[in-house]
Amino acid sequence: MRRETVGEFSSDDDDDILLELGTRPPRFTQIPPSSAALQTQIPTTLEVTTTTLNNKQSKNDNQLVNQLNKAQGEASMLRDKINFLNIEREKEKNIQAVKVNELQVKHLQELAKLKQELQKLEDEKKFLQMEARGKSKREVITNVKPPSTTLSTNTNTITPDSSSVAIEAKPQSPQSKKRKISDNLLKKNMVPLNPNRIIPDETSLFLESILLHQIIGADLSTIEILNRLKLDYITEFKFKNFVIAKGAPIGKSIVSLLLRCKKTLTLDRFIDTLLEDIAVLIKEISVHPNESKLAVPFLVALMYQIVQFRPSATHNLALKDCFLFICDLIRIYHHVLKVPIHESNMNLHVEPQIFQYELIDYLIISYSFDLLEGILRVLQSHPKQTYMEFFDENILKSFEFVYKLALTISYKPMVNVIFSAVEVVNIITSIILNMDNSSDLKSLISGSWWRDCITRLYALLEKEIKSGDVYNENVDTTTLHMSKYHDFFGLIRNIGDNELGGLISKLIYTDRLQSVPRVISKEDIGMDSDKFTAPIIGYKMEKWLLKLKDEVLNIFENLLMIYGDDATIVNGEMLIHSSKFLSREQALMIERYVGQDSPNLDLRCHLIEHTLTIIYRLWKDHFKQLREEQIKQVESQLIMSLWRFLVCQTETVTANEREMRDHRHLVDSLHDLTIKDQASYYEDAFEDLPEYIEEELKMQLNKRTGRIMQVKYDEKFQEMARTILESKSFDLTTLEEADSLYISMGL
């Protein structure tokens, strides 16, 4: 039984095993657990290694990127540093080049100074040699007597004890005596320096110049005149440290201000303070309706003396403020320059014939314009880099109003003021021309600003100048003349005969303080009216007016160089007015002035040549800006004027010296006498006139005589005229035009 039961259990187990084996998959598809574990472990390890590799690679990439960025930053820094070093090197090169140029200029200046000193020493040596030769001829050489025989016999018989004394008392030679005598004479002729001498400083010299300033024609100095003036309606004037008490003399207060400033201020601060204080005082007097204006012209004269004393000590800002103030002052007294040309029929002349108030107004206006000119002259002496600190729109607007008053067309002109206004314009053009970089100033002073100014200069150029009518007030407005009521010297120029200069002192009482001027009658001026008709006075005034026109031509020439491309300035109008002026002056020389014994004929010839130079530059460099109708307008006059330069017999004009001497005696005798005086100076210096100097003087005389006679001009001007005539713009090909031209010229 037990075996049966065991057999049954064994058969059941086998069945179970078989069933289990039947349900299992094939053997080759089964993976042992170890391999399965390996398969599960391999991807995980691969993932770990790949992530670690990726992390390492990303770290390496980040490091490389950081290194690249760092290298790029360092490269850019090095590049910037190289650029900076290159810029510094260029700056150093430029600085070194400037220094080299400055050293070269300085070296050349030193060489020039040494050459001058050497030449001076050589001249002194020659003069000393000549003086020594002259003395040697006059002096007689004195022979020294030989020692006497008695002395020689005594010296032979002297005792040994006295021999030493005899040896010490040797006779001296004549040369040593002569040398000692000359040394003594030199010592006696030497002037010893005073060790206690005190050299005045700049402020002391400045104070002295103000205290000694005197207007030409006045009997008293300016400070002495102000010492006799007081403020009547202004109770007390006070500005900072400048105080004028009621009834106190103006000059005394100014002197006390000068003494206080001298102790504490340097020269530049001294000048700034004085200009400001005096300007405020002038303003208070001018704007007060009841206060007398008697002190104003003398205060303006003091301001001019302050400005021009030391140009380097007057700052640009002080000059600018002073310029604006004077323009405002002229605006206050503008009624002086707005006198109608023709008197009204309603004027019955019943007012009192007094002149003192008119004289004060004329002095204020004239001195103010002189101060404007003086300010710009001081500015011109300053460094070129500082010019732009002065000019701005306010300066230009103020001066535009001022020059329109001076260069008037609708009112009676005042010649003293015209000179200053024209010179201010000339200085402005010279400043622009001489600047290293003038583009900023050219853009500030544009062509539109110049348009009206040039028109007024054209009108001034058209006015005629006659020596007999320079003081004639009955002539028309086409002739330049000076009124006898304006005949006083200015602060810069001595124009006229200063007939009214003596009346300045008559305004002032010498024995009391005053605020109102003394009475001056117009009849006092008419007493010496015959003096104005003297020829020499007329010639002097004519010379001044001719120089005025030369200044106008200088302005045109400067504008050609500055605004050559600006058609609003350089255009056919300039050609028209220049051609008319050239033709008119040549006709006057031929018809009226040849044969007159006038010292101004050569100056008129210079104006003709100067005008031709302007026309030549217009024609040569700016022809595109000239319109054809403008050229046709003056074509006949211009052709005639140019032919007058060419039609002369060059070979025979100066051939006969005797004939030229006769011509000089007829047309230029005064200048001939002047040259003879110069020749006498040479004869006094050299004991005889050197041949080369004589030839040079003769050549100058002959050229001058030929120009005055209008028969010979210099070759360069003839070449200018020939160049214009031979240009394609003139068509002189027809026989009728050529015949009419030659007939009109008398050929």
From Swiss-Prot:
Residues 146-160 have a biased composition (Low complexity). Phosphorylated by MEC1 in a cell cycle dependent manner and in response to DNA damage. GO terms for cellular component: ATR-ATRIP complex; cytoplasm; nuclear chromosome; nucleus. Its main location: cytoplasm. InterPro entries: DNA_damage_chkpnt_Lcd1. GO terms for biological process: chromatin organization; DNA damage checkpoint signaling; DNA repair; establishment of protein localization; nucleobase-containing compound metabolic process; regulation of double-strand break repair; telomere maintenance via telomerase. It comes from the Eukaryota. Keywords: Chromatin regulator, Coiled coil, Cytoplasm, DNA damage, DNA repair, Nucleus, Phosphoprotein. One of its GO terms (molecular function) is damaged DNA binding. Residues 62-139 form a coiled coil. It is found in: Cytoplasm; Nucleus. The modification Phosphoserine is found at S10, S11, S76. Residues 145-180 are annotated as: Disordered. Forms a complex with MEC1. Forms a complex with the serine/threonine kinase MEC1 which activates checkpoint signaling upon genotoxic stresses. The MEC1-LCD1 complex is recruited by the single-strand-binding protein complex RPA to DNA lesions in order to initiate the DNA repair by homologous recombination, after the MRX-complex and TEL1 are displaced. Required for the recruitment of MEC1 to DNA lesions, the activation of CHK1 and RAD53 kinases and phosphorylation of RAD9 in response to DNA damage. Required for cell growth and meiotic recombination. Present with 606 molecules/cell in log phase SD medium. This is DNA damage checkpoint protein LCD1.
